[in-house]
Amino acid sequence: YTLNYSFTTAQEIMQGLLAGKVDHAVLGEPFLSIALRKDSTLQILADLNRPDSVSSGFAQTAILYAPAIKKSQKAIDSLLHLSCRFAVEQPEQAIRILEKEKIFASGMLTPESIERCKIDYRTASEAQENILRFLQLIGQYEPKALGGKMPDEKFYK
């Protein structure tokens, strides 16, 4: 079994699956849900986003603050936490808002796709261990991506 990186975007991977050019793939949302809707024979073999006793998951997205709004960080963190809880607790309404605001095209998201995302907002200090583990993984394969060193404690504040 060899790895094939000739498909470089999630959309290309999804199209490769649907065209039968790809047998196995790691595919994130919303492309996973779109592929499952278009081809009912596709199956999820593993959920890489399921924290368990062995792995607590890893940070997938970072929110960066411009220095000018750093003073509002607590309020922004609170709003982001509430927004994420809203998406988890009321996925249909969240989908309507995301579609209305043209963040996602109509039909791209489903309540199942939101559930599979395991949305859980944490501040950098709350997620420090997971962030560090993720950065160490990146550092193993591409140290230049980290500027050759791990961030110091100020990074998590």
Where do the language-model regions lie?
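Surface-exposed patches in mature extracellular/periplasmic domains of secreted proteins
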Residues: 5, 87, 94-98, 146-151
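Conserved C-terminal helix/tail region of periplasmic/extracytoplasmic solute-binding proteins
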Residues: 132, 136-157
